[in-house]
Amino acid sequence: MDVLVLIGRILFALLFLGSAVGHFTQTDAMAGYSASKGVPAAKASVLFSGAMLAVGGLSVLLGIWADLGSLILLVFVLPAAALMHAFWKESDPQAKQGEMVHFNKNVALGGASLMLFAFFAHTPELGLTITGPLFHLG
């Protein structure tokens, strides 16, 4: 079971770590996109969200307070879904569909982040982690 959980953590974290790299290597382009969506202080927001993605992703991947890392990712993906992928504001059907896919993906990742938080905070028995949970749910 420990190995399966580790494989799941790796697969989950890779998405966020890859996105963090994009935030740091394509900051100006992402800031322009963020500004077009009405995000205030777009460049600072891109850098801050990149840091959230990196810290949360590494935390889950390495098992260092993975419960906290899961919450950090949750705090990123749910607002990002609403702010960056507001499909209901799109008039072009193709753009609307694309934003809906991204919105739904972020909501699903938020659900997965919440489940990971609960798993990590409920039991220290998930194995192959560097630290135990920061929070304790039971």
Could you say what each language-model-derived stretch is?
Residues 1-29, 36, 40-51, 55, ...:
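Extended, low-polarity transmembrane helix blocks
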